[in-house]
A protein has these predicted regions:
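A composition-driven surface/loop motif
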Residues: 1-37, 46-49, 55-59, 68-72, ...
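Alpha-helical and His/Cys-centered functional microenvironments
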Residues: 63
Length: 460
């Protein structure tokens, strides 16, 4: 009948509307879930960029926020869906209530699962970030030492051994400790010094991997039997805070390594028996302040196996040396550049190397022998060449002294300048006073050229 057809049409329309509302609810759920995941992703990204000290706290907060947001979204969606169901029921008595309730249940289930997934992802990423940025703390308390990670650091009496690459922070005070980086470590190690004071102690890396010592706050290490800091490979000493590090040894060098880089830090070095800095291949000092008192050489860079190795470069730094033997001695090139200030008081030569290149800053030398000495390749103690991997015929640098921009002042008991090769002054200033009768103010075996600058030579 016509009434039956009308009733059937109304039921069909109500069913269609219910389907549309279910679709809308699912779409809303999808959008809400997407927003939740996006929020979690953004939170995770922000968390990754924070410092390591607050990573765990921030990430936990992110996880909690994500969960709370998801719960609130689920509750809101449930309420809105419930209200929609009620309105639909009131307006159209033929609508199936059970269909709306099923849709609501599915929506809540989807949101709950997505919130759980988001929390799981955030927690997993948090654990990964923490693992990558972990710093093991080694705390010295007088006669005891405590480490925050016994799997990477072992303590045997007064011997502390670092067994894995990574970052380690030393704090506290102690005496008679030996900190060792095991030779089995193949990747770089960073040791942070945070106000640590160690007496009769040393840091030694037996690994060929790079060792970085980062001074967080003023620290000191003194040794009575070893090099205060020694590295079999490359050693870098730096500070992002402008802090100072005091190193001393009564029996050996203050610092010994294959190569040494001193960057943006203040170093006070004392050796009562040997050198302030002793390196094999190279020493680089930049943006730093270095004070050295040494019974032997202030800085020695000598490679007995390679005639083109053994270099020193000082850039934009203040270096003060008081040495019983030589101030600075290298087997290859010695360069002072930028806005550097180098002051040397030496019992023997002030500066010594094969090629001495002074292009910036000021250099003040007081020497018991030659002020500046450019010499043929030999080692300090011997001219034996049996261990060379190349030969003296492979020399790349000429034997020479080049002054081009620096201001150099010399007071010497020997020769003011002594070059077994050439002497060239292109710009800058050279002031030389020489006191002994048997030597010269400027002595060279090759060619002497003054093409610019100012030269004063007073003496023989």
């Amino acid at each position: 009948t016509t009434a039956d057809l009308i009733e059937e049409s109304v039921q069909t329309e109500d069913s269609s509307n219910t389907s549309e509302k279910s679709t809308d609810t699912d779409t809303s759920t999808t959008t809400t879930t997407s927003d939740t995941v996006s929020s979690a992703t953004s939170s995770t990204s922000d968390t990754t960029e924070t410092s390591s000290s607050s990573e765990t706290s921030n990430q936990s907060s992110t996880s909690s926020t994500s969960e709370a947001s998801s719960s609130e979204t689920a509750a809101t969606t449930n309420n809105e869906t419930s209200e929609t169901a009620t309105t639909t029921t009131d307006e159209r008595s033929g609508t199936s209530t059970s269909s709306t309730e099923a849709t609501t249940s599915e929506t809540a289930s989807v949101l709950t699962n997505n919130a759980s997934d988001t929390t799981s992802e955030t927690t997993t990423e948090s654990s990964s970030d923490d693992s990558e940025s972990t710093t093991t703390t080694i705390t010295f308390n007088g006669t005891t030492v405590v480490t925050s990670n016994s799997s990477t650091v072992t303590v045997d009496g007064t011997t502390v051994t670092i067994n894995q690459s990574g970052s380690y922070t030393l704090t506290g005070n102690g005496s008679s400790y030996t900190i060792i980086v095991a030779g089995s470590v193949t990747d770089p190690v960073t040791i942070y010094l945070d106000g640590v004071t160690l007496t009769d102690s040393s840091i030694t890396s037996n690994s060929s991997a790079e060792l970085t010592v980062n001074v967080l706050s003023d620290s000191s290490i003194s040794s009575t039997s070893a090099n205060a800091i020694e590295a079999a490979g490359a050693l870098t000493i730096t500070s992002g805070t402008g802090s100072s590090l005091t190193l001393s040894s009564t029996e050996k060098h203050a610092i010994k390594a294959d190569s040494v880089t001193v960057d943006s830090v203040t170093l006070d070095l004392t050796s009562e028996a040997k050198d302030g800095i002793n390196a094999t291949t190279a020493v680089t000092i930049k943006n730093a302040t270095v004070n050295i008192t040494a019974t032997d050489d202030g800085i020695q860079v000598e490679d007995e196996t390679d005639v083109n190795s053994g270099d020193l470069t000082i850039t934009d730094s203040t270096v003060t040396i008081n040495a019983t033997d030589k101030g600075i001695t290298v087997t290859d090139e010695l360069t002072i550049e930028g806005n550097s200030k180098v002051t040397v008081v030496a019992g023997d030569e002030g500066l010594e190397g094969r090629y001495i290149n002074l292009t910036g800053g000021t250099v003040d030398i007081t020497a018991g022998d030659d002020g500046i000495n450019a010499t043929e390749w030999t080692t300090k103690d011997s001219a034996d060449t049996s261990s060379l991997t190349n030969s003296t015929s492979d020399l790349e640098n000429e034997v020479a002294i080049n002054i081009d921009g620096a201001t150099v002042t010399i007071l010497a008991d020997g020769d003011g300048i002594d070059s077994n090769g050439n002497v060239t002054v292109k710009s800058g200033s050279l002031y030389v006073a020489q006191t002994s009768a048997d030597n010269a103010t400027i002595d060279y075996d090759g060619t002497g050229i003054i093409s610019g600058g100012t030269v004063w030579a007073i003496g023989n």
